[in-house]
Amino acid sequence: DEGPTVVIGDLHLGYEHALEQDGLYLPRINTGSIRDALNDIMSRYEPERVVLLGDVKHDFRRAGREESNQVRGIIDLISEDAQVVVVRGNHDNYIMAVSHIDIMGYRLEHGHEDSGVRPVIIGHEHPSVRIPGAVGGGMKIQCFVHAEKEGVIVIPPFSPFSSGNDLVMDDDCVMAPALKASDYADARIYGVTDMGLMDLGTLRSLFDVKVRRYNIGLYIQYTDSVHWLL
């Protein structure tokens, strides 16, 4: 039975605690933000299954009490209404997980390794695009990446702390083997905004993008089109 399924990845639970071990202190907002977003998703879409697509936890080491409690709490929250499938990411040492799952004709795997099966949905990459402003500055948008010809879909991280690898400004930053093996410059980019998903064109087209701010709003200007953001 393949009922409605939600796929999220790269939660990196325990992120703040891991940084504290190195003397860096951040507001403890990661788990709370993830819980709020999950509650919204569960009530809006009523999925029968939720796939956690790897890097559920942050620390590579065995989970401590705090990280374990956060992971257990998120899984328990989802389990109240849906089946939970945990796919193993490269951070997910010492937790129960599967290497992949096949759903509706798609291979779902974290993405730090490539099984070679297509079409595939992966995380791991933390994709984003940074669009420079005309007078400096700019903005960074988390995004989905769809390399349709190669059958590769990359989802953005679910953690609010994961700002993402900038595919526009540093095309050498690509980590996921499946994405590296594709012609990702021609992949379609879908930005995640407060208004929903926004088609930003291909990655190749974004190399020439400019952002201009006017008192009537902010828009992304391409060579051949304008997409309103605000």
What are these regions (language model features)?
Residues D1-L53, K57-L230:
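Extended recognition/assembly regions associated with phosphoester-bond processing machinery
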